[in-house]
Amino acid sequence: MQFTNLGRTGLKVSRVCLGTNMFGAGYVDDGRAISVIHSILEHGINFVDTADAYHDGLSEVVVGKAVKSRRHDYVIATKGHFPTGPGVNDRGSSRK
């Protein structure tokens, strides 16, 4: 697997990233999704993409469960702009 620098963060990420938009909503069984996330390390992939907007944050929950025991091995990219609730601080990059 080829790796590249993630901007100026000092992190090295695989050039292939696992997208998790289908995880957490029943499209893919959570157990299977977790197995997929575990298996990518065997193929040299350390980069996982998710978002709070993917199925009301359920994708992030599945990713969290999957990486819990080996968190230091993964680089997780997420997005945090879309509304997650009705409150004034439930969207965007608020401090909350």
Spans of model-derived segments:
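N-terminal binding-site loop/beta-alpha segment at the start of enzyme catalytic domains
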Residues: M1-V75, F82-T84
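Glycine/proline-rich, positively charged
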Residues: Y27, P86-K96
